[in-house]
Amino acid sequence: MSRRNKNVLAVAGFALAGIAGAVSASADDSVNTGYFGGVAIMGYDPVAYFTENQAVKGSEKFSYEWLGTPWHFANSKHREMFMNEPVKYVPQYGGYCAGEVVGGSVTVNVDPEAFKIIDGKLYLIYDEGNANHFAANAKELVPKATANWPIVKAKLEVDQPNWESINSP
């Protein structure tokens, strides 16, 4: 084998190892961090959804690691509130699109600004139109999503023992 072919094979091997590593890293995540962000809710402050009823971008300056994932907050007060009661503020279904979970699948693509708080729980959705539909039909859709979540989690091949208790009704 020529030196050039060995170099090509080496580069291809490293590329494949990188892809496999990326897949296994995302499969081990306990929280939806999107494709590239590595941070929960794409860096938005989970507490602000409840205190300000809007999506507010957090800061790395006010971060806290929970379930192996960094969470960002707009200020130290929000970070402290989350640290004291994280279950109160985390999005349902691991931060995956609640509308997709209803259908038995997931997309990591959620719009942090397309959210609904229903019965004191945060639901992230793919887009605003679907968020409005989800909220308008919550009595039907939330139980379906909740029933589908264990199946969807299994499809993700993610070991998330903490989500079992967090997202139980």
Task: Describe each region flagged by the PLM.
Residues 1-12:
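Bacterial N-terminal signal peptides that target proteins for export
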Residues 2-3, 20, 29:
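Compositionally biased, low-complexity segments enriched in small residues
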Residues 11-21:
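Bacterial N-terminal signal peptides
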Residues 25-169:
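Charged, low-complexity intrinsically disordered segments
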